[in-house]
Amino acid sequence: IRDCLLSRGLGDVYKRQEIEAQGDVVAGKEILLIPTLNYSSMNAEKKKWISDDSDINRSFPGNIEGTATSRIAATLMDRVKDYTYGIQFASFYLQGISIPHVRMMETGTESTSLANLFGMPYVLTGDTRSFDTATLNYNWQKMGTQAFSVYSATTDTLDGESAKMAVSAVLRFLTRMGIIRYESHGGYISTTLKEKDLVSVRADEAGFFRCIVGVNQEVKRGQVLAEIINPMDGNIKAEVLAPTDGIVFFVQNSPLVFQNVVIYKIVRRMHQ
């Protein structure tokens, strides 16, 4: 059994080095860890390819004769094609804070039972949209690899506790699959959700965003989640109300919001 980790942080590199040094990788197993595919952009504090703003994660399966990002994608696909499991530390597509979770695309080959072994609070599955066919996760699954995207709470800020939860989830999965020897607690009994079942809350007005209810908090229908403040006079332009009972899955964390953008996502309460 071989496992590939595509990481967004050095903490994962250090942890792998520690595991290898202690001889905790089970005989006959192999772990490949790739810290990043885009060093130059990372050094310039950019997410996309620095020269043309193209997205590597919209370039798969890639073309070895194509553009820079397409060549990188093709090289990666060739390097990881024989691995049984693939884990990507991904960034949430909206700016903000979310409950840590693991996500799989619905390609017909996904296994939520395997995703539950990470022991994260939620397993999120999503329909495959047209642009998803050019992502790493989708193409990994199509190659026969069980591919997972692991999300910590934030991407653009340091959150030690959230990052520790994500790394622990991966170590837990590798332990349960018999790839490493590692003592870890059992984690969460994961709740499996479809991405389309998350209730989106949009801003009715533009202005300063004053968050009242944060992520992972329980809310009641009609409860005030946030206020949007007029930047000219400081008065409240609008109150953001919860459309349903549930738990806040995501909240945006920008001080300014535009009208009609998603500012909250709520897990609808399933049982009374």
Where are these regions (language model features)?
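Conserved active-site and cofactor/substrate-binding residues in soluble primary-metabolism enzymes
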Residues: 51, 67, 71-74, 110, ...
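Generic structural motif
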Residues: 179-227, 231-264
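Active-site/substrate-binding loop(s) of hydrolase catalytic cores
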Residues: 12-135, 139-153, 158
